[in-house]
Swiss-Prot record:
Name listed for the protein in its UniProt record: Pituitary homeobox 3
Sequence positions bearing Phosphoserine: 52, 57
Keyword tags: Activator, Developmental protein, DNA-binding, Homeobox, Nucleus, Phosphoprotein, Transcription, Transcription regulation
Protein family: Belongs to the paired homeobox family. Bicoid subfamily.
Source organism of the structure: Rattus norvegicus
InterPro entries in UniProt: HD, Homeobox_CS, Homeobox_Pitx/unc30, Homeodomain-like_sf, OAR_dom
Name of the gene this protein is made from: Pitx3
Pfam families: Homeodomain (PF00046), OAR (PF03826)
Length: 302
């Protein structure tokens, strides 16, 4: 029976010999067990004093030492940070000498301080965006409130209504003439009332235009007393009579007027006055005293 079993085993695996069949093979180790054996060996080699450099990398990292700054050191660092947020190498070395610190510690402190400053700026901007535009006006940071103590934000006085036109003066037109009575007239009044109220002096005194002094007196006087005040300071104008005639015709509402005839009459009057009006002659250059074109008064040195 044994030979029959061996023959079947040889038929299945011809490379198998009798000696191999007699000695059983040990079981193959699994991958997990193999890795565990390697880790145990590495731990054992790391615990030995004469370990390799690769074993040293597995050691725990050294813990960083936290630097404790004194109040004097923090005061000096903060003062320098307010002046310069990005100090160069030489400045950091000087600060290290003053504060009895290393340059690396000073550099790290400035780096952390800048990060804190940026974070604070971002938080303030986020608060302003959330609160809208009322937040910066209601509560400012202390430096701005110290610089501008007189401004009271959020407590602006209510808008006052603009004064009426009667209270305003126009210095560029009539030397600070009060235009109260003119402004008190209705805006959309009939043409007859406008002509009667605005040109009372021209209807009473044809050919005259009131001067600045007369207009000042006219400001507070009623329309009936206006001609007496205007007659004192009058300046002649060629077109005043036509305007006076038109105003006089417009001021009498009970007389029938033909618009065509009145316009033709006013145009004829304007044409006559324009023809009779002459500008003053401009004095010309003095006549030449028998001098030829080539003679000039040239002063020659003696």
């Amino acid at each position: 029976m044994e030979f029959g079993l061996l023959g079947e085993a040889e038929a299945r695996s011809p490379a198998l010999s009798l000696s191999d069949a007699g000695t059983p093979h040990p079981p193959l180790p699994e991958h997990g067990c193999k890795g565990q054996e390697h880790s145990d060996s590495e731990k054992a080699s790391a615990s030995l004093p004469g370990g390799s450099p690769e074993d040293g990398s597995l050691k725990k990292k050294q813990r960083r030492q936290r630097t404790h700054f004194t109040s004097q050191q923090l005061q000096e660092l903060e003062a320098t940070f307010q002046r310069n947020r990005y100090p160069d190498m030489s400045t950091r070395e000087e600060i290290a000498v003053w504060t009895n610190l290393t340059e690396a510690r000073v550099r790290v402190w400035f780096k952390n301080r800048r990060a804190k400053w940026r974070k604070r700026e971002r938080s303030q901007q986020a608060e302003l965006c959330k609160g809208g535009f009322a937040a910066p006006l209601g509560g400012l940071v202390p430096p701005y409130e110290e610089v501008y103590p007189g401004y009271t934000y959020g407590n602006w006085p209510p808008k006052a209504l603009a004064p009426p036109l009667a209270a305003k003066t126009f210095p560029f037109a009539f030397n600070s003439v009060n235009v109260g009575p003119l402004a008190s007239q209705p805006v959309f009044s009939p043409p007859s009332s406008i002509a009667a109220s605005m040109v009372p002096s021209a209807a009473a005194a044809p050919g005259t235009v009131p001067g600045p002094g007369a207009l000042q007196g006219l400001g507070g006087a009623p329309p009936g007393l206006a001609p007496a005040a205007v007659s004192s300071g009058a300046v002649s104008c060629p077109y005043a009579s036509a305007a006076a005639a038109a105003a006089a015709a417009a001021s009498s509402p009970y007389v029938y007027r033909d618009p065509c005839n009145s316009s033709l009459a006013s145009l004829r009057l304007k044409a006559k006055q324009h023809a009779s009006f002459s500008y003053p002659a401009v004095p010309g250059p003095p006549p030449a005293a028998n001098l030829s074109p080539c003679q000039y008064a040239v002063e020659r040195p003696v």
